[in-house]
Swiss-Prot record:
GO terms for biological process: translation. Signal peptide: none annotated. It comes from Methanothrix thermoacetophila (strain DSM 6194 / JCM 14653 / NBRC 101360 / PT) (Methanosaeta thermophila). This is Large ribosomal subunit protein uL14. The keyword Nucleotide-binding does not apply. The lineage of its organism: Archaea, Methanobacteriati, Methanobacteriota, Stenosarchaea group, Methanomicrobia. SMART domains: Ribosomal_L14 (SM01374). Part of the 50S ribosomal subunit. Forms a cluster with proteins L3 and L24e, part of which may contact the 16S rRNA in 2 intersubunit bridges. Binds to 23S rRNA. Forms part of two intersubunit bridges in the 70S ribosome.
Length: 132
């Protein structure tokens, strides 16, 4: 897992609802906490593209609902700037359910995936249809 070259604004707080962009059976995810987040006292943990979060499944198949998983954020609405000056933003906030190592649980990913995520998590990049 490599660091990001772009400075990603952390716009996804705990308590945010995300779309699940894979075929695991989950549809809506709820962010419980952020993995490897080191903040200060009384500051809400927040995440951006390429960060791993702990999520709870709110909508989906009965087997998936009310369960806790790790997920990687692959899209966010808040725009971010790449080192070459290009600004990128997506239509929705979306994540992919993974294990602790960052290997996706599903076999396909719906919609585009940010290039920063593809560089950081190779297994997510291999199952993505579009990398932006």
């Amino acid at each position: 897992m490599r660091g990001n070259k772009a400075k990603i604004p952390r716009s996804i707080n705990t308590g945010t609802y995300l779309e699940c962009a894979d075929n695991t059976g989950a549809r809506t995810l709820f962010v419980v906490s952020v993995k490897k987040y080191r903040g200060v006292k009384n500051r809400q943990p927040c995440a951006g593209i390429g960060d791993m979060v702990v999520v709870s499944v709110k909508k989906g198949t009965p087997e998936m609902r009310k369960q806790i998983f790790n997920a990687v954020i692959i899209r966010q609405k808040k725009e971010f700037r790449r080192p070459d000056g290009l600004r990128v933003k997506f239509e929705d906030n979306a994540a992919v359910i993974t294990d602790d190592a960052g290997v996706p649980k599903g076999s396909e990913i719906k919609g585009p995936v940010a290039r920063e995520v593809a560089e950081r998590f190779g297994k997510i990049a291999s199952s993505a249809a579009i990398i932006v």
